[in-house]
UniProtKB/Swiss-Prot annotation:
Gene3D superfamilies: Winged helix-like DNA-binding domain superfamily/Winged helix DNA-binding domain (1.10.10.10). This is Forkhead box protein I1-ema. One of its GO terms (cellular component) is nucleus. It comes from Xenopus tropicalis. It comes from the Eukaryota. The keyword NAD does not apply. SMART domains: FH (SM00339). Transcriptional activator. Activates ectoderm, in addition to inhibiting mesoderm and endoderm formation; required at the blastula stage for normal formation of both the central nervous system and epidermis, the two early derivatives of the ectoderm. In addition, also required to maintain the regional identity of the animal cells of the blastula, the cells that are precursors of ectodermal structures. Also plays a role in differential adhesion, which limits cell mixing as primary germ layers become specified. Keywords: Activator, Developmental protein, DNA-binding, Nucleus, Transcription, Transcription regulation. Residues 1-23, 208-274 are annotated as: Disordered. It is found in: Nucleus.
């Protein structure tokens, strides 16, 4: 039997049925405009009876979005639609392309009709000190009274029109407690009441240009006469004074036995005391005169240092064998002095796990040529 009736073999459908013209439901037609349907879907061009060969020549059994070749049949509202389907579905297809860009009239349903109403609900991202600084900068004379500052904030930021008592108290507290705002008395010939408030020139760097974002106040900007007093150590050349000179002389007299070469090796005075202490400790570590008397590097426990001291005693009491032809006393002395810490490489071979991070690998961890017994 080459042909069959699909109506006889199909089970009964539940719910409302759409017209048998090969159309999908209107919801699918609205939101999936370019769905690639497989070839087996019934269409208006197909007859009611199909051959079995038509089912075997399926191009693609899947649904593909944005199909290039096959598009669904257009939705045709009319008398063929079911009785339960409202007639307004036929107009949704023409309204969807126009919804990509909404104009001002399309937002009429929003509870916020204008931008001013939105600004009343959003708190400005500025501190009270920044608001005062903005008001003073905007004044022609760079000074304003308290009432003028209130008026500036209320006019430019509608958020503060709701409760004036709260933010006005904060404005007064910032004017009295912040050192950046200076009170200027009113002139005798100037009528009115209340003093003027101006911005300290040393505090202008607390705000970025135009942004008025709060920055940490630096002591170098606040100190008078441009002198840097508290951020610099006593030995810095920018802060020379007679007291510092006397202190330097006292340090020089307290150590009369120091060599001139050690003074040349001392690093120049640095800007920060932490860097000065670090450089001085590193210089003393590298340029020490007696390598044997150096302290053990950091990161070693007490146990390896004690063992090292015992090995040092055994090494100092050891005398080289004179009957060996390839190694003499001078060779052993050169071997001991070749190590950066004054120890031979054979001693350091016992402590290699503890010296990986502190000892030069070229001189200590590997034996040099001619040093093995």
């Amino acid at each position: 039997m080459s042909a069959f009736d699909p109506q006889a073999h199909s089970p009964p459908r539940c719910g409302p049925q759409f017209p048998s013209i090969g159309q999908e439901p209107p919801e699918m037609n609205i939101y999936c405009d370019s769905i690639f349907h497989p070839q087996t879907m019934p269409s208006p061009q197909r007859p009611s009876n199909f051959e079995t060969a038509d089912y075997s020549t399926t191009a693609n059994p899947y649904l593909w979005l944005n199909g290039p070749s096959i598009t669904p049949p257009p939705y045709l509202p009319g008398s063929n639609t079911s009785h339960f389907m409202p007639q307004s579905y036929g107009m949704q297809r023409q309204l969807l392309p126009n919804m990509h860009g909404l104009g001002g009239s399309d937002l009429g349903w929003l509870p916020i009709p204008s931008q001013e109403e939105l600004m009343k609900l959003v708190r400005p991202p500025y501190s009270y000190s920044a608001l005062i600084a903005m008001a003073i900068h905007g004044a022609p004379d760079k000074r304003l009274t308290l009432s003028q500052i209130y008026q500036y904030v209320a006019d430019n930021f509608p958020f503060y029109n709701k409760s004036k008592a709260g933010w006005q108290n904060s404005i007064r507290h910032n004017l009295s407690l912040n050192d950046c705002f200076k009170k200027v008395p009113r002139d005798e010939d100037d009528p009115g009441k209340g003093n003027y408030w101006t911005l300290d020139p040393n505090c202008e760097k607390m705000f970025d240009n135009g942004n008025f974002r709060r920055k940490r106040k630096r002591k170098s900007d606040v100190s008078p006469n441009g002198q840097i007093s508290s951020d610099k150590p006593e030995g810095s050349p920018l802060n020379e004074s007679p007291k510092n000179g006397e202190h330097h002389d006292m340090l020089g007299n307290s150590s009369p036995g120091t060599d001139d070469s050690s003074e040349k090796r001392s690093p120049p005075p640095s800007i920060t005391p932490c860097l000065n202490n670090f450089l001085s400790s590193m210089t003393a570590y590298v340029n020490s005169a007696n390598p044997v008397s150096r302290s053990v590097p950091l990161g070693l426990t007490n146990e390896p240092s004690d063992r090292m001291g015992q090995n040092m005693v055994g090494l100092n009491s050891y005398t080289p064998l004179s009957n060996m032809p390839s190694h003499g006393g001078s060779d052993w002395s050169s071997t001991i002095s070749s190590s950066p810490f004054g120890y031979s490489s054979s001693v350091f071979n016992q402590f290699t796990p503890h010296f990986y991070n502190t000892i030069n690998a070229n001189n200590t961890l590997y034996n040099r040529e001619g040093t093995e017994v």
